[in-house]
Curated annotation (Swiss-Prot):
Record gene name: sin4
A cellular component term, taken from the record's GO annotations: mediator complex
Keyword terms, alphabetized: Activator, Nucleus, Transcription, Transcription regulation
Functional summary from the UniProt entry: Component of the Mediator complex, a coactivator involved in the regulated transcription of nearly all RNA polymerase II-dependent genes. Mediator functions as a bridge to convey information from gene-specific regulatory proteins to the basal RNA polymerase II transcription machinery. Mediator is recruited to promoters by direct interactions with regulatory proteins and serves as a scaffold for the assembly of a functional preinitiation complex with RNA polymerase II and the general transcription factors.
GO biological process: positive regulation of DNA-templated transcription
Pfam families, sorted: Med16_C (PF20719), Med16_N (PF11635)
Source lineage: Eukaryota, Fungi, Dikarya, Ascomycota, Pezizomycotina
Protein name, per record: Mediator of RNA polymerase II transcription subunit 16
Length: 955
């Protein structure tokens, strides 16, 4: 029998044209790398979030090999002032804790401080941001959990924090101006009675776990079995958890495609805990689960028509439902920003996806890639058979529990694969990310696409105002920033990509649409106000402002923010409100950041005003807390670390006051020739940019100066009556006293000078007929635009002609004139620039830091480095740097003493800078071990051996 090939059969006749292997099949679209693996992952387990952006600003993501967790964050680059993603920092404690197990899920808690990491065996470890965004310490080890495949986590949720926050419903245009609707948003339980962290997990085997932290910081756990109708229902694939007013709502999906709904209550015994109660000792609260409702929805499959025909088209075959698998399960709550409260019931949303490579035999019957199946959760009365009415009841007023129902809504189809569904902007927007990298915003209630063109007079979110994500290269995992102004994606190769939301700002087709521009500014303002009220990091908003807005638009945003919060800039009377005002430092911080250029270039004049006010506020609050924590001096002596901080801020406050006086003396000399020509005086004042003059005229900064004087006077008087001090505390307090004693102006004389300025400002307002209702306008002009309003020109004239000359007899003007104020960083002269390039000042302690090798002259640095291969005069040192203002702090560990720790926490400086930006740990740098001289009027801060040893370490 001859072989087939002997007849000379051409192989090309079997497969098509010569040189081609085209089989006549329809061409398939190219899928992103790793998409098939991602869809399989989403199908097999509900908890598979590989990247998460916390509300504190930290981005954590799992490496491509699944063994490490890295963190990044937004930061302002000191060299050029550009906002970028930081370099990645590996979290070594995570790798050690999980011992080689594959990491599958990340989840931040509501404040964005604690991070939960789950591996493929269901083991959970918990970490916390300690002193910087890239400094995370372990709290709970994964070794506490057994290594069991049945313990895999399919659903996870953190307990909310029990605190009421300020929120904003919307912005509506009224008579040409935007009106913002603030209200108080109450938290949704359940809560930990000690206000500690709590984590709820659902496992594959149908076990609900609560990991909670005891008052001593240790973690404990309780667990219970979810009620199931059969054994096969226990094998869960997905679980969605959310806090509601009626308890925790849990939706689960089992391997047999059953959807179960539970309502779980966590009961604590005792319900309250007072750690201050000593006798009798109060036991720690112990939780327990109580199941309230259970509902089973068996039909959770895909029902639909052919995607190439209209909905409900008759006579057309349905697409193959059995091909679809559940790849996502979520519970969507109604918007939290609602002044009437969250009254609408939640929705259950399930994502069903078709296999990536389906059979091509009947392409006309192929369904869409993704189908969104939705159920409305309804509660109604439990209806009984009429015969039950004839049965006598012992309880006439017996209450029947409401029935929990799931009402299926219309399905939503998409020809693209959905890889993520996120509820952003406080529940106002549902963001769905697809496999091609596109992000589409939907209305959570109707699933209608939000395109931003519906109503230009009402703004509820960034998406509704027209912000969108432009098409970019695809990624497999996504997480949105705290205020949804940006997103970070993780691609198939484990690389992160930053994506920013964009807007036309009214510039379309060469024309300007004022309505769209105004709506965009209002949306950014609304997002900023919501972030301030919820104590959320707003660096993503700042990123948009810096990259996309013109200086004029930035000024419009600042004015809107002051009006929306609202902030009354007039503090001529109610000065005590300054100390505890939550929004003033937020606005000052973003003002100062908008004018930052780079580390070596002076800020813009308009931003230098809020920057100086932030420093004055820091010193004022520091002195107030110093006296508060040292009232019981006999039982709680002064802490050396606190006194060192007070010493540095005292020197800074004195030098700042001398700098203000020196500038005013120069201004008085410049304007002396114009004393008889008021018109010329006014014109010259318009062209004068003087930071000290604006600081004195503004009631806000003038009040802070008065608070500082009060604190300095109290410290000076308290030295004689202080409890006996020893060691470093005695040295620091003695230096504080000596610094005040040798000052070229007495504190009472400076207070008298401030009183004269205050009198001149009051007379100017009174002379112009400005009452309390009219004064906020000029005060805002000073603070926001750094301009002297016309109503205060007479006050400037009085200050320069009367108040300043009257002070000359009470000061040592030569000492003030010869002082070196370059270390303050507020002037634009060459001496300040040289100091800025060679030294850093600890922004918290106000103590000059040791110069790093990069700041030393190049020849000296090279000479030191060439000595035997390494420098004998340099040591390694780590510092913290603010991601917003780029200032540094030499502390790289939490305060050691309890008093110092309480002080730093009360000041809000444990994780954040004076400006409100977050800290990041810099890589190790070389610093000079030899002390260098401080500028005139600024003595070198003494560093005790014990403190120096602590500062040398890193967290």
């Amino acid at each position: 029998m001859p072989l087939i090939m002997e007849d000379g059969i051409n192989v090309d006749d079997l497969f098509g044209e010569p040189g081609s292997l085209e089989l006549g099949l329809s061409p398939s679209t190219t899928s992103p790398r790793g998409l098939a693996q991602r869809l399989d992952e989403m199908r097999l387990i509900g908890c598979c979030q590989k990247i998460a952006w916390s509300k504190l600003g930290c981005i954590a993501y799992i490496s491509q090999d699944g063994l490490r967790v890295n963190v990044r964050h937004l930061q302002c680059r000191p060299s050029d002032g550009k906002w970028v993603l930081s370099e990645e920092t590996p979290l070594l404690p995570v790798t050690d804790a999980h011992g080689g197990h594959t990491l599958v899920h990340l989840c931040w808690n509501e404040p964005g401080v604690e991070l939960a990491v789950a591996d493929s065996s269901g083991r959970v470890s918990i970490y916390s941001i300690s002193i910087a965004l890239n400094s995370i310490a372990g709290h709970r080890q994964a070794a506490f959990d057994p290594d069991d495949d049945g313990a895999q986590i399919v659903g996870m949720m953190w307990l909310n924090t029990q605190r009421t926050v300020h929120s904003f419903y919307q912005a509506a245009k009224v008579q040409g101006r935007w009106a913002y609707s603030p209200f108080r948003r109450r938290p949704i339980g359940p809560f930990h009675p000690v206000n500690k962290a709590g984590l709820v997990c659902v496992t594959r085997s149908g076990i609900i776990r609560l990991l909670y932290q005891n008052p001593d910081g240790r973690w404990a756990e309780i667990s219970a079995e979810l009620k199931n109708t059969g054994y096969s229902d226990r094998l869960l694939t997905h679980a969605a958890l959310v806090s509601t007013q009626g308890g925790i709502l849990i939706a689960t999906h089992s391997a047999c495609q059953k959807l179960c709904l539970y309502r779980v209550h966590i009961a604590w015994t005792p319900t309250q805990y007072d750690p201050g109660q000593q006798k009798p000792p109060v036991p720690w609260p112990v939780p327990s689960f109580r199941f309230l409702h259970c509902k089973v929805e068996s039909q959770c499959d895909v029902r639909g028509t052919n995607r190439h025909a209209g909905d409900n088209a008759p006579g057309l075959p349905s697409f193959t439902n059995s091909l679809y698998c559940l790849t996502g399960l979520d519970i969507v709550l109604p918007a939290l920003d609602n002044p009437a409260g969250s009254t609408a019931n939640p929705w259950v949303v399930a994502i069903y996806s078709a296999p990536l490579h389906v059979t091509q035999d009947h392409p006309q019957q192929q369904g869409p890639a993704s189908v969104f199946v939705r159920w409305q959760l309804d509660t109604g009365p439990l209806t009984l058979h009429p015969k039950f009415d004839d049965v006598p009841s012992k309880k006439n007023n017996a209450q029947v529990k409401p029935k929990l129902e799931l009402r299926r809504l219309d399905d939503v189809y998409s020809d693209k694969y959905a890889i993520s569904i996120d509820q952003i902007e406080y529940g106002n927007v549902l963001a769905i990310t697809y496999d091609d990298g596109s992000v589409v915003f939907y209305d959570p209630k109707t699933m209608a696409v939000v395109n931003g063109v519906d109503d230009a007079n009402t703004v509820t979110s960034l998406a509704q105002a027209g912000f969108h994500h432009p098409p970019e290269p695809s990624g497999l995992h996504i997480s949105f920033s705290p205020n949804a102004c940006a997103a970070v994606m993780l691609d198939g190769e484990g690389q992160t990509h930053l994506r920013l939301t964009e807007h036309s700002y009214g510039a379309e087709g060469g024309l300007h649409d004022e309505n769209k521009y105004s709506a965009a500014i209002a949306a950014l303002t609304l997002a900023f106000c919501r972030g301030c009220g919820s104590d959320v990091n707003t660096d993503d908003i700042l990123l948009i402002l810096v990259r996309q807005l013109t200086p004029e638009a930035q000024a419009t945003f600042i004015n809107e923010a002051y009006r929306a919060l609202p902030i009354n800039c007039n503090f001529t009377v109610e000065q005590d409100k300054l100390m505890n005002h939550p929004y003033i430092p937020r606005c000052l911080s973003i003002q100062a950041a908008l004018g930052f250029k780079n580390k070596y270039t002076p800020r813009s004049f308009a931003s230098s005003i809020p920057w100086a006010v932030l420093q004055l506020r820091h010193a004022s609050v520091l002195y107030a807390f110093f006296f508060q924590y040292n009232k019981g001096g006999t039982t709680e002596p002064h802490d050396p670390d606190v006194l060192r901080m007070v010493l540095g801020n005292t020197k800074w406050a004195l030098d700042f006051s001398f700098y203000v006086l020196n500038e005013l003396f120069d201004l008085a000399d410049d304007f002396e020739s114009l004393s008889g020509d008021q018109e010329a005086f006014t014109q010259k004042l318009k062209s004068t940019s003087s930071l000290p003059l604006i600081i004195l005229l503004s009631s806000m900064s003038r009040a802070f100066l008065r608070f500082i004087c009060r604190g300095l006077r109290g410290i000076y008087a308290g030295y004689a009556t202080a409890a006996p001090l020893s060691g470093d505390a005695r040295v620091y307090y003695a230096e504080i006293y000596q610094t005040l004693e040798s000052a070229p102006i007495r504190i009472d004389a400076y207070e008298k000078f401030l009183a004269g300025v205050d009198s001149a400002v009051r007379h100017a307002y009174h002379g112009a007929g400005f009452g309390d209702a009219e004064r906020p306008g000029p005060e805002k002009e000073l603070l926001v635009n750094a301009r002297v309003p016309p109503v205060l020109v007479p006050a400037v004239s009085t200050i320069l002609r009367q108040t300043v000359p009257a002070l000359k007899t009470e000061i040592d003007r030569i000492t003030i004139y010869m002082g070196d104020y370059s270390w303050l960083g507020l002037s634009n002269d060459r001496r300040t620039e040289m100091y800025r390039r060679s030294r850093d000042v600890d922004i918290i302690k106000k103590i000059p830091c040791r110069p790093t090798a990069s700041a030393l002259p190049e020849t000296n640095a090279n000479a030191n480095a060439n000595q035997n291969g390494k420098s004998s005069t340099q040591v390694q040192q780590r510092r913290r740097r603010c991601v917003r203002c780029c200032e540094v702090s030499s502390d790289t560990h939490p305060p050691r003493s309890l008093l110092s720790f309480r002080m730093i926490v009360k000041l809000g400086l444990l994780r954040a800078c004076v400006c409100g930006g977050m800290w990041t740990l810099e890589p190790s740098v070389y610093s000079s071990a030899q002390p260098s001289g401080a500028p005139v009027g600024q003595a070198t801060g003494r560093t005790p051996a014990l403190v120096a040893a602590g500062l040398a370490g890193s967290s």
